[in-house]
Structures are given as structure tokens and as C-alpha cells.
Amino acid sequence: MAMARYAAFLRGVMPMNCKMPALKAAFEAAGFTDVKTVLGSGNVVFDARSGSETMLQQQAEAAMQDHLGRAFLTIVRSIDQLRKLLATDPYKPFKVSPKAKRIVTFLRGRPTAKLKLPVELDGARILTMKQGEIFSAYLPTPKGPVFMALIEKTFGKDQTTRTWDTVAKVAR
């Protein structure tokens, strides 16, 4: 079986609740190789024998439970898949303001919610969905990222969100 490069996006990780060297060690204990963390927010890139995203997610979560004493919801995508996503620029048709933050929400499964898009709430717009990803943009406000409540209400908590810039850093 050939090795492939993957990215794991973990929900709820921040430097205060998970040290990156410990996270890296947990992924290595899961049998993944060439493991690197990207930024301090739960982004891990690694090599693994090709397998289903679901299998890799379960493997990573089990290793975190064993080595960190807790598991973070993990969503895996292949690096090839992320590069294709970046190349398509799903924001292009929407005339997104240069000041807006572009964000991608990765879903654990396929979306079950039927939404007429784009949806707007307090300056945040959910623009489009493609398979397991939702693309949004918002202008930062003092209220913070209000769209997160809308995304959770619509798609549940089996998801995690990253900025477009973070996805680009992870896919490099």
C-alpha cells in the first residue's frame, strides 16, 4: 500500500488545552509518520498508508485518548484534496470584500441540512457547500464570529472551522 499525505483538523484545540509536541507524539503513536503540527490550533499533517478518512480519524482519536487522556473531534482530508480545493477558489463567484475573513468549515460527514445559499447573518455569509466543506465569509465585528452559532445550529458540532489562509498553510 502506498503512503499518502493527510491533514487532520481537530476541533477545540488551542495552546492552553493541548501542547503541540504531545499532540505530535500521539499521532506518531497512532503509527503515522513525518508528523508535523501547523500553528497552535489543532492542525496536524502526516503520512499514512492509504485508508478511509473515517479509519484515519478513528485511529487518531484513539491515540489521543490513550496518550493525552482526551480525544478531540478529528476531521481528516488528503493533502491532494486540500490543494484541489484551494485551486478551485470557491469564493470567486461571490464578490467577497477584501477585508472579509474567508473560512472553511470541514464536516465530519456529508451535510444533511438543506440550505438555500447564500445565507447572511450579521455581516456573515454562508456562501456555498461542496461535499464535506462549507465556505463562508465574514467581516470581523466586536460581536466576534457570529456565524459560528449559525453553522453549529445548522450542521451540528461534528465540524471544525479554519481560515482559508490556514488551509493554504496546511496544504503546502
Residue ranges and their predicted role:
Residues 2-41, 45-172:
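Surface-exposed, charge/polar-rich loops and edge strands
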